[in-house]
Amino acid sequence: MKAEIHPDYHTIKVVMTDGTEYLTRSTWGKEGDTLNLDIDPKSHPAWTGGNAQIMDRGGRVSRFQKKFSGFLKKD
């Protein structure tokens, strides 16, 4: 394995949506940084079986719905 071509692999803290925290090793951020999750297995509809709306970050979903709202309408 070549030296000094791999990203730094260090310990970070991950905070889930319910406040649960755990330490893991990652190449994300710097040593000791905290990663706050917006969606995780405890809140994502795919894992919870719910049909909850996923938070529209940056208005992307809203813009898409507005742009294509009448595309498949049948009169």
UniProtKB/Swiss-Prot annotation:
One of its GO terms (cellular component) is ribosome. GO terms for biological process: translation. InterPro entries: Ribosomal_bL28/bL31-like_sf (IPR034704), Ribosomal_bL31 (IPR002150), Ribosomal_bL31_A (IPR027491), Ribosomal_bL31_sf (IPR042105). GO terms for molecular function: rRNA binding; structural constituent of ribosome. Keywords: Ribonucleoprotein, Ribosomal protein, RNA-binding, rRNA-binding. Pfam families: Ribosomal_L31. Gene3D superfamilies: Ribosomal protein L31. SUPFAM superfamilies: L28p-like. The keyword Ribosomal protein applies. Binds the 23S rRNA. PANTHER family: 50S RIBOSOMAL PROTEIN L31, CHLOROPLASTIC (PTHR33280), LARGE RIBOSOMAL SUBUNIT PROTEIN BL31A (PTHR33280:SF6). Part of the 50S ribosomal subunit. NCBIfam families: L31, PRK00528.1. Belongs to the bacterial ribosomal protein bL31 family. Type A subfamily. This is Large ribosomal subunit protein bL31. It comes from Bradyrhizobium diazoefficiens (strain JCM 10833 / BCRC 13528 / IAM 13628 / NBRC 14792 / USDA 110). The gene is rpmE.
